[in-house]
A protein has these predicted regions:
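Residues within well-ordered alpha-helices
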Residues: 34, 72-73, 160
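Bacterial N-terminal signal peptides
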Residues: 12-20, 118
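N-terminal glycine-rich anion-binding loop in soluble enzyme alpha/beta folds
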Residues: 31, 35, 44-66
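Bacterial N-terminal signal peptides that target proteins for export
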Residues: 1-12
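Sec-dependent signal peptide cleavage junction
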Residues: 19-36
Length: 180
């Protein structure tokens, strides 16, 4: 019986590896598009893609609560391009301002930016816990995980992902694997 399990496991691993080696229908097209874009980028732009910053760091006045993309920030973004921004509660005033901030950053960047937020649920929810937003609030992902109900996790993911996408975010720093 043990020998049978080993063979079955080897077969599953072999099939998975073989499947991973098959080219996808999009891989050549996507690779070509990326390669074409890279040939037009300067070294500074390529290195800038490695960095994600808070919006206010692009305004050297050190005002920690920037809620709009200023002309200075726009100029600094052009001179010091970055790959993305991480938005925090202090950068958020209301729904219209948030959508405008994200759209303005995207339009000011030559390359589509990663726009991230920390929307884990529970105490860490920059939008759901903000007084200007009427969004569903979830307990922490840890609490949902403790229920053992995958449908609750799926529902949280769909809901949070949906409203983040609506506002222009394309990365959520969640779920996380926090341990006590």
């Amino acid at each position: 019986m043990r020998k049978l399990w080993k063979r079955a496991a080897a077969l599953v691993v072999s099939a998975a590896l073989a499947g991973a080696m098959l080219p996808s229908a999009f891989s050549k097209e996507a690779t070509d598009a990326v390669e074409a874009k890279l040939t037009t980028m300067t070294l500074q732009e390529k290195v800038g893609q490695l960095f994600w910053v808070r919006p206010e760091t692009l305004d050297f006045s050190l005002n920690p609560e920037k809620k709009t993309l200023t002309q200075t920030m726009r100029q600094n973004l052009e001179q010091y391009p970055v790959g993305g921004i991480a938005v925090f509660k202090k950068n958020i005033q209301d729904e219209n301002q948030l959508s405008s901030l994200i759209a303005d950053f995207q339009s000011a960047s030559k390359i589509p930016m990663i726009v991230a937020v920390d929307e884990e649920g529970g105490a860490v929810a920059r939008l759901a816990n903000h007084e200007a937003f009427s969004l569903p609030k979830y307990t922490s992902a840890r609490d949902i995980g403790k229920t053992g109900d995958p449908e609750q996790a799926r529902q949280m993911g769909r809901t949070v992902g949906g409203y983040l996408r609506f506002y222009g975010f394309n990365l959520d720093f969640a779920p996380v694997a926090d341990v006590d």
